[in-house]
């Protein structure tokens, strides 16, 4: 081939490739920590939807450290991403991130951890995808109520009260607060007095939950514990490990304490199948991930954010609420 023709052909090809790349959307995502089971499911959904939409998605593990996440966001902004999808380590530290994105004209989609309303309102290109935590709390409490009504012997001392342990997410996390409050309310609304034998923050972590539960067992005696409510499945599974060490929740109906969690993760569904976990609540990671990536794409393109465009109901032009679903022994196989 003539060198001049080759050079022109190569130049044309490079220009075409550069143009094609320039037309792609680059989205930067930060997840508060990669080893959170639910957020692993969310980011897997995000990656699948990004591939389907032709988005170049770069994800960073913030390792549960807000300063690290701040640096990651700075790097993404310097890199010139078209949109950010953020799962903040500390939702109360979201304002500076929004300010930086706003100054650069970059849309921000928060997912799973909701910043304060004034932060979301501070920039017209900020959105939130999540679920209403009070729903999951209500459904968790209802499962305990249903169990006690169907199994009168669950009230070990026959005093008509549910004597329970509560394992919570991190201190100050909105979902932890609401799941706790509304699960307690649901038990009272179900006609029971409730007695909290112990409550502590296990920070969404299975190992911490096992340690906390062992402490409660030593403090109050396993024979007095009638129910265990956990703000997520990892903590529920951690609590079950502590129960199993005492010979409970291993198949003997006389040694069973109802435990409920939230998220409907694969390990939780497996625990439901073996009978060690009473129930959980589906925190729909798949649809949360899909909605987040669609919002990122539409906002980066300057498109109108409508229900039809996103494929989900958009509240106040900013919020996508993905409903929770109660997962019981009667329907858990539908979610496996």
Label the model's feature ranges.
Residues 1-22:
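Gram-negative bacterial Sec-dependent N-terminal signal peptides
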Residues 86-103, 183, 197-271:
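Hydrophobic alpha-helical
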Residues 56, 97-135, 153-163, 265-273, ...:
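Flexible loop/hinge segments that line or gate small-molecule binding clefts
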Residues 160-163, 167-171, 175, 289-336:
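Hinge/cleft segment of the Venus flytrap/periplasmic-binding protein
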Residues 28-29, 81-88, 107-111, 166, ...:
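Periplasmic-binding protein-like
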Residues 38-52, 136-140, 174-193, 208, ...:
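Short, solvent-exposed amphipathic alpha-helices that sit
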Residues 25-45, 49, 53, 57-75, ...:
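Extracytoplasmic "Venus flytrap"
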Residues 69, 127-161, 209-213, 264-268, ...:
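Hydrophobic alpha-helical segments within soluble ligand-binding/sensing domains
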